């Protein structure tokens, strides 16, 4: 998982390779993201992210749980399928219903999932101090790429 914020003043990017995910045969899914797992180019950005914005000591995980409409075994054809993941996105303790366009593709041993969507910090009660507000975009681009192994 990766997020990216761009403004004329500064770009901010972080990656997290500690995400756990589950996709069931009926299309039900769950993603869990440990907030402390995000890594930034600058240590100070990471510290501010965890202590001041996401408050990882209080809200240690983000999550997205729901289902993919019309998810069937017929999708195991090796082709890429556009789907809509519907569920509850929880960030900073705030739940929000979301519909996120995604692609799924059977790779022979499991599912490759990709999605790009935006999150507004204000929608999740994440307060950005006025002094740095022009350095953080009002919407953050989130990219998810996951390979889920069938069990």
PLM regions and their residue ranges:
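Low-complexity, acidic/polar, glycine-enriched regions of mature
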Residues: 1-151
């Amino acid at each position: 998982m990766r997020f990216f914020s761009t403004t004329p003043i500064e770009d901010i990017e972080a990656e997290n390779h500690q995400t756990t995910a589950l996709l069931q045969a009926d299309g039900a899914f769950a993603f869990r993201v440990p907030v402390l797992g995000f890594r930034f180019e600058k240590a100070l950005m990471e510290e501010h992210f965890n202590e001041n914005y996401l408050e990882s000591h209080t809200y240690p995980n983000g999550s997205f749980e729901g289902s993919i409409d019309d998810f069937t075994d017929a999708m195991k054809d090796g082709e890429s399928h556009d789907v809509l993941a519907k569920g509850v996105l929880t960030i900073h303790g705030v739940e929000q219903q979301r519909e996120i366009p995604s692609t799924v593709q059977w790779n022979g041993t499991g599912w490759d999932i990709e999605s790009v969507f935006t999150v507004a910090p204000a929608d999740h009660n994440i307060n950005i101090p006025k002094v740095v507000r022009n350095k953080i975009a009002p919407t953050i681009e989130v990219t998810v790429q996951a390979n889920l192994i069938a069990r």
